[in-house]
From Swiss-Prot:
One GO-annotated biological process of the protein: methylation
Family annotation (InterPro entries): DNA_methylase_N6_adenine_CS (IPR002052), HemK-like (IPR004556), N5-glutamine_MTase (IPR050320), PrmC_N (IPR040758), RF_methyltr_PrmC (IPR019874), SAM-dependent_MTases_sf (IPR029063), Small_mtfrase_dom (IPR007848)
CDD domains per UniProt: AdoMet_MTases
Keyword DNA repair: no
Residues given in the record as S-adenosyl-L-methionine binding sites: G124, T125, G126, S127, G128, D147, N190
Protein name: Release factor glutamine methyltransferase
Function: Methylates the class 1 translation termination release factors RF1/PrfA and RF2/PrfB on the glutamine residue of the universally conserved GGQ motif.
Cystine pairings recorded for this chain: none
Gene name of the encoded protein: prmC
Length: 285
C-alpha cells in the first residue's frame, strides 16, 4: 500500500477522537520513527510503499491511539529541549512548559557556570529531563537528581547514558527527608501539583496512562511538596542559592506567599507560553 493512501485511512480512523492537526502530528511522528522520513520526503517521493510488516506496525500503533494511549508511550520515546528521551508509564511525558523552566535556568546561570562549578539538584526527576538538559547545557555543573520511584530512576539513568551526561541519581522520598546533607547552588523541582478537583479538566490520555504519583496531590494540602522542598532549601541552599519551581497555574499567589513565609527574596513569578502562571524563582539570603 502507498503511504499516502494509508494516510487517508489513518486520518479517518482517528477523526472522531482527535482534531486534524493532532492526527497529522501523530502521522508524521510515526513516519519518522518507523521510516526515518520527514513530511518533505513524502512530498518528494509520493510512491513510497508500506510492506505487510510495516503495515502491521502502523495498525498496531493505530489501535493504541484509538484507546488514547499517548504516542510517546506507544513509541517509548520523545524529545525534550532538543534531546531524545525514553519514556514509559513510570515517567511523566515532558511538557513544553517544563522546557521553558529549563531555558530560564540556563539563561540565568550560563555565565556563572563558566566561572564556577555549580551544584544543581532536581527533586522528583522522573525521566530525568530537567537534570539531563541542565547537565547538557551547563557542562561545568555537578547535577544530582532525586526520585521516590526506582522504576522512574532506571529510565532516567538510561536517558543520562543516551545523552552522554553524568548525573548522580538518588532514590529518596523527599517528604520523609529532613536534610539533604550537602549544599546546592540551585534546587529545581516540578513536583506533583494537580489537585484531585482538577481531574475533570484532565484528558483521558493523561488520566489513564500517566503515573498519578507524579501528578496529583490532595485538595486539602495542595502545596505539600512545595512546603517540604522549601523547608529543605532553607537548610541546603548555598548563600545566594536559587530555588526554581514549576507550579500549578491556579496557585501562583499561594505559592509566592508560601515562599515569602520562609523569607526567600527576589521572588519572580513567570507565565508560560499559554499565559498561565507556571514557574517561580527565588533567591536564598
Amino acid at each position: 500500500m502507498l503511504i499516502k493512501n494509508y494516510r487517508t485511512q489513518f486520518v479517518q480512523a482517528l477523526a472522531s477522537i482527535f482534531d486534524e492537526k493532532e492526527i497529522e502530528s501523530f502521522f508524521y511522528i510515526i513516519l519518522e520513527a518507523f521510516h526515518q522520513l520527514k513530511r518533505v520526503d513524502l512530498v518528494l517521493s509520493p510512491d513510497l510503499k508500506l510492506d505487510n510488516i510495516q503495515l502491521l506496525q502502523w495498525e498496531t500503533v493505530l489501535l493504541q491511539l484509538k484507546e488514547q494511549k499517548p504516542i510517546q508511550y506507544i513509541l517509548g520515546e520523545t524529545q525534550f529541549f532538543g534531546l531524545p528521551f525514553y519514556v514509559n508509564e513510570n515517567t511523566l511525558i515532558p511538557r513544553p512548559e517544563t522546557e521553558e523552566l529549563v531555558e530560564w535556568i540556563i539563561k540565568e546561570n550560563l555565565k556563572i557556570s563558566s566561572l564556577k562549578n555549580l551544584k544543581i539538584l532536581d527533586i522528583g526527576t522522573g525521566s530525568g529531563c530537567i537534570a539531563i538538559s541542565l547537565a547538557k547545557n551547563l557542562p561545568n555543573a555537578s547535577v544530582f537528581a532525586i526520585d521516590v520511584s526506582d522504576k522512574a530512576l532506571a529510565t532516567a539513568q538510561k536517558n543520562a547514558v543516551l545523552n552522554e551526561v553524568d548525573i548522580t541519581f538518588i532514590e529518596k522520598n523527599i517528604l520523609q527527608t529532613e536534610d539533604l546533607n550537602q549544599e546546592f547552588d540551585i534546587i529545581v523541582s516540578n513536583p506533583p501539583y494537580v489537585r484531585n478537583l482538577e481531574k475533570k479538566e484532565i484528558h483521558k490520555n493523561v488520566l489513564e496512562y500517566e503515573p498519578h504519583l507524579a501528578l496529583f496531590v490532595e485538595d486539602n494540602d495542595s502545596l505539600l511538596f512545595y512546603r517540604k522542598i522549601t523547608e529543605l532549601a532553607t537548610r541546603n541552599l548555598s548563600n545566594n542559592g536559587q530555588l526554581y519551581f514549576e507550579i500549578n497555574q491556579y496557585l501562583g499567589k499561594e505559592t509566592v506567599e508560601l515562599l515569602e513565609k520562609y523569607n526567600f527574596k527576589n521572588t519572580t513569578l513567570k507565565k508560560d507560553i499559554y499565559g498561565n502562571d507556571r514557574m517561580i524563582k527565588v533567591n536564598f539570603r
